[in-house]
């Protein structure tokens, strides 16, 4: 039990966890970051089409392009789920367990994109701190993003917790 002066009480007494869960649902809905992922994939596709130092463009690597396309398909599906969820929120409904799905898939897509960037940057991604003298462009940021966004699967409730929420509330397990 926590004692709070009546002047500092927010909402009804004893409803703190209920309010916290609603706030977490909204945070998870926003964790999908589809707009950022879409921009990063578009930029990566443009970079893959360019030849670097006379080497064939990465766009000619079928395995890389297959992986890129798979992430694009996942992202497109996530965008539709996000739009449906946002439409429900706009009509006055609270985000439900789909917010867990948005967070789960959104962060996994972000990490898949970071992995593609690391693969595309090759050895230019090795420096953790950006050094303008290394690489053709922004490759050195790949490692920074890759390591920094490992946290995405932890904040707003770890992805393992999101899987449990989905199993309980969506699948009825």
Predicted region positions:
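Short, well-ordered loop/turn and helix-capping segments at boundaries between secondary-structure elements
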Residues: 3-5, 25-26, 46, 50, ...
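Generic detector of well-ordered alpha-helical segments enriched in charged/polar residues
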Residues: 21, 42-45, 65, 86, ...
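C-terminal helix-coil-helix/basic helical segment that borders enzyme active sites and/or dimer interfaces
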Residues: 59-62, 76-134
């Amino acid at each position: 039990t926590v004692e709070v002066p009546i002047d500092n009480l927010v909402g009804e007494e004893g409803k703190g966890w209920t309010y916290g869960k609603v706030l977490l649902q909204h945070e998870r809905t926003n964790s999908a970051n589809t707009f950022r992922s879409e921009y990063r994939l578009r930029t990566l596709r443009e970079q893959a089409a360019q030849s670097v130092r006379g080497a064939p463009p990465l766009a000619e690597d079928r395995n890389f392009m297959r992986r890129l396309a798979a992430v694009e398909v996942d992202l497109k599906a996530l965008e539709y789920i996000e739009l449906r969820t946002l439409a429900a929120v706009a009509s006055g409904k609270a985000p439900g367990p789909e917010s867990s799905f948005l967070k789960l898939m959104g962060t996994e897509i972000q990490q898949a994109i970071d992995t593609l960037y690391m693969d595309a940057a090759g050895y230019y991604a090795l420096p953790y701190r950006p050094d303008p003298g290394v690489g053709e462009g922004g490759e050195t940021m790949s490692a920074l993003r890759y390591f920094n966004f490992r946290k995405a699967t932890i904040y707003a409730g770890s992805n393992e917790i999101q899987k449990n929420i989905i199993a309980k509330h969506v699948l009825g397990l």
